[in-house]
């Protein structure tokens, strides 16, 4: 989901949680303040920052800026949200290493990744660089999230074997070429999914290109094709 709220201010939220296998909150524009179970006081998520909300972690949204925009990815997309009438946030405990089990018994840690602290490295696709959000490690490879920018070199045709491969265009433009498909010129606000083993190429990327890539699983193979 791409969520946009034009008028900010205090949010009349209650302590709640989601019965979900994986959930990402990426701040695209503006900022939002949130309380999380066992993570201390209010945390402000700025543009370029992200959270993952482990399964059933209690949380409450406090306040948001005008024009806040967030990208929310939940798996499954349709899931149950429940109110916790007994818990008060913040909790007295600070447990940054706590793990919340998913339906498969794998523990997931809360992640607050700050964009301004990013270190950029070569991406899995030639011609691009990426910042790893540590979500692959925190979820034991349930999911991976990277922010991608234009690097050096010419983009090449490649394919992947991830079960789910979703990308949101945050800034800039490029042409998405797919095997057996017409090319699409994509711009900020567009999104796409690439099926496993489909040959694609990100051609003619603008210098200001920035992509949000979300994959399940977090660890997968990419083959130049």
Model-identified regions with their sequence ranges:
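A short, N-terminal "cap"/entry segment at the start of jelly-roll beta-barrel domains
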Residues: 1, 7, 80-150, 223-225
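Residue-level recognition of conserved beta-strand positions in structured domain cores
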Residues: 2, 36-38, 63, 72, ...
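A structural signal for the main folded, soluble domain(s) of proteins
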Residues: 2-5, 11, 16, 28-31, ...
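Short, conserved beta-strand element in jelly-roll/cupin
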Residues: 3-6, 17-34, 147-151, 159-177, ...
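Short histidine-centered beta-strand/loop micro-motifs
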Residues: 12-19, 36, 43, 62-63, ...
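Short acidic-glycine-tyrosine-enriched beta hairpin
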Residues: 38-56, 178-198
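A short hydrophobic beta-strand segment most commonly corresponding to one strand
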Residues: 50-52, 65-84, 141-146, 191-193, ...
